[in-house]
Amino acid sequence: MTDSRGRPARAPGLRQWLASVAPARARGTVVIALASDAEVRKLNLRYRRKDQTTDVLSFPAERGSAARGQEPGAGLLGDLVIATGVARRQAAQAHHSYATELKVLALHGLLHLLGYDHHALDDNGRMARVEARLRRRGGLSAGLIERAGE
């Protein structure tokens, strides 16, 4: 877990929690970066051509890539970048802790790394159902899609 400058960031238990709720096919490493809203806005503009901040960005790894220090075949699922300011505001709005919001966002981002896309026309609520099942497994009362009313 790093900040936007690559320095270690503190989000105690987040990686372990995500690993405990992840679907079986989520094999490999997920790099999670906690970044400022301004940094996430820059990334959102650069990679999605949207000049606004967002809560979490997902960057899937190329197939076959391996994370540093991992055995061949273990692989890298990809990177998640979470906007800390947005996460804090959303936590307050949802009446739960910042740590809980980080879990909500990390789970949502992981599903995007696995190829789910709730904005796709052919999704038909599939990502929302998977997110709901996994968040219940992890003890979360609501997921990002459910909160957004999608």
Located regions from the model:
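An acidic/histidine-cluster motif and surrounding catalytic segment
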Residues: 1-103, 113-150
